[in-house]
């Protein structure tokens, strides 16, 4: 009988997987290539053969994150075909799982905070990724019939970022535990606004004689009386 065991991961895959785990635990700047290579069961020479530098390895790790997120979007579409509102609610549920995870935050968000230099090779990739995710969420909101789609996309994005920080500072039982309830309430509020609210209609009154203010009328009457007395 043939051995159906899965083939062991290749050196490149082991390096990326190990690096992602170590970056999440210790921070990108808190771990060196020697430790990554050792824990990946390889050596520094092999690491540099696959990745020209540690910065290149960081970008490769972030590309893996982006691929996982792309698979997440594909999953929404497969689970709820032609139902953008259901996909939007699926995004909220997935966001809750992400925010309430192991407390180490999102790899992409952590890298954005740690790699603040504008000239870092990973910085441009992070910004493009974040912008693309925001645009994609906004498109989904528009497909769901939300009038202020861009505003809802930003509201949900900020809610997710805040939930991740809350998970790290207040724990899993903190405000992040109510992410789904809050996210769905926000969607419902925007969805109800999308139906259109009737604006109050004001009747235009027919033009008539201008009303004289009461004080002005009194002054006028007094002036008239004074003139009569002077005659």
PLM feature segments, named:
Residues 98, 157-175, 186-195:
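Amphipathic C-terminal alpha-helical segment
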Residues 60, 74-104, 143, 153-156, ...:
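Hydrophobic alpha-helical connector segments
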Residues 86-87, 99-124:
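Amphipathic alpha-helical segments used for helix-helix packing
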Residues 1-10, 191-231:
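N-terminal intrinsically disordered/low-complexity leader segments
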Residues 8, 16, 62, 66, ...:
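Amphipathic, non-transmembrane alpha-helical scaffold segments
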Residues 14, 18-56, 60:
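Helix-turn-helix
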Residues 69-70, 86-89, 118-143, 154, ...:
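Amphipathic alpha-helical packing segments from all-alpha helical-bundle domains
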Residues 58-65, 72:
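Alpha-helical DNA-contacting segments of helix-turn-helix folds
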């Amino acid at each position: 009988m043939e051995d159906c065991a899965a083939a062991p991961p290749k050196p490149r895959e082991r390096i990326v997987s190990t690096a992602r785990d170590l970056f999440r635990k210790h921070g990108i700047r808190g771990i060196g290539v020697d430790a990554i290579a050792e824990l990946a069961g390889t050596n520094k020479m092999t690491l540099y053969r696959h990745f020209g530098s540690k910065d290149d390895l960081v970008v490769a790790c972030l590309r893996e994150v982006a691929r996982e997120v792309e698979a997440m979007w594909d999953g929404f579409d497969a689970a709820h075909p032609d139902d953008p509102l259901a996909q939007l609610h699926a995004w909220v549920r997935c966001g809750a799982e992400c925010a309430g995870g192991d407390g180490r935050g999102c790899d992409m968000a952590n890298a954005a905070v740690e790699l603040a230099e504008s000239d870092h090779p990973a910085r441009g990739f992070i910004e493009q990724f974040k912008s693309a995710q925001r645009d994609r969420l906004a498109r989904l909101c528009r497909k769901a019939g939300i009038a202020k789609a861009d505003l809802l996309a930003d509201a949900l994005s900020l809610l997710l970022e805040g939930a991740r920080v809350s998970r790290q500072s207040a724990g899993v039982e903190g405000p992040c535990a109510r992410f789904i309830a809050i996210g769905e309430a926000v969607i419902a509020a925007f969805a109800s606004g999308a139906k259109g609210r009737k604006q109050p209609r004001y009747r235009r009154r027919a033009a008539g004689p201008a009303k004289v203010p009461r004080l002005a009328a009194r002054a006028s009457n007094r002036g008239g009386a004074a003139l009569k007395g002077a005659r």
